[in-house]
Amino acid sequence: MSTLHHRLTITDLAALKGRQKIAALTAYSTPIARLIDPLVDFILVGDSTAMVAYGRPSTLAMRLDETISHTRAVVDCTRHACVIADMPFGSYQASPEQAFRNCAQVLSETGCDAVKLESNRALAPTVAFLVERGIPVMAHVGLMPQFVHVMGGYKAQGLTEASAETIVEDARANLAAGAFSLLLEGVAEPLARRISQQSQQPCIGIGASPACDGQILVTEDLLGLGGPQQPRFVKQYADLTAVIGEACARYASEVRQGEFPELAHCYGS
């Protein structure tokens, strides 16, 4: 973990490649962001907000105004971690100009440090357009949830020669376009290892390889708040579902039995 003297930048993240693994998590709200801020190198305000915070069926339902609201909340309560906003589906695919307009709005209204785009070769020119105009971009390749209907579901990528070649070409195109980092999701381990070793920019894995330059998980998943069915790549470090359930059950029981509040919890008593 890096020092707490300043908010980390994309330059700081790049400098960690080959020196120290990058630890990253998601956050959508002040309580979680404040807790993880001193512990991680960057926080992703993911489009997974749509599912985790709002209970929607997929990330496709995330809206731009929600991205701005949640990212601003995370930026306002953190001081250390680099904050990256995940651009929602439909906010950047139509044209480079649309992408710049929406990404610029996110950066200017939230104070975040960079944006993340799910980007294949076809969108690499958009990445270049953004970088040339001052917007740092992390490119997400491999399993891209915003492409779920095209990909036929949430399936691991790079398991066949053709799929692996597609991912390699997507990665190369985005790095050549100026992406400061790659996020490799659901990519076959040998392929993710090779891309990470060959890339001069940090490669962050989620369901990819321990050889990646860093790792990211959805915070609620590692805390046991993500529901009973989790992807293979999730490691649960705590079971807060049980802890929270027990605490709330005790509260409800004490209220119904007249045990809470006690006079110690009241004013003027």
UniProtKB/Swiss-Prot annotation:
Co-factor note (free text): Binds 1 Mg(2+) ion per subunit.
Organism expressing this protein natively: Pseudomonas entomophila (strain L48)
Gene Ontology CC, one term: cytoplasm
Gene3D superfamilies (alphabetical): Phosphoenolpyruvate-binding domains (3.20.20.60)
Function of the molecule: Catalyzes the reversible reaction in which hydroxymethyl group from 5,10-methylenetetrahydrofolate is transferred onto alpha-ketoisovalerate to form ketopantoate.
Record: active site: E185
EC numbers: 2.1.2.11
Similarity annotation: Belongs to the PanB family.
Keyword Cytoplasm: yes
Keywords, alphabetical: Cytoplasm, Magnesium, Metal-binding, Pantothenate biosynthesis, Transferase
Subunit-level organization: Homodecamer; pentamer of dimers.
Protein name: 3-methyl-2-oxobutanoate hydroxymethyltransferase 1
A GO MF term: 3-methyl-2-oxobutanoate hydroxymethyltransferase activity
Catalytic reaction list: 3-methyl-2-oxobutanoate + (6R)-5,10-methylene-5,6,7,8-tetrahydrofolate + H2O = 2-dehydropantoate + (6S)-5,6,7,8-tetrahydrofolate
Localization terms from the record: Cytoplasm
Chain positions recorded as 3-methyl-2-oxobutanoate binding sites: D47, S48, D86, K116
Record InterPro entries: Pantoate_hydroxy_MeTrfase (IPR003700), Pyrv/PenolPyrv_kinase-like_dom (IPR015813), Pyrv_kinase-like_dom_sf (IPR040442)
SUPFAM superfamilies for the chain: Phosphoenolpyruvate/pyruvate domain (SSF51621)
Pathway: Cofactor biosynthesis; (R)-pantothenate biosynthesis; (R)-pantoate from 3-methyl-2-oxobutanoate: step 1/2
Disulfide bonds: none
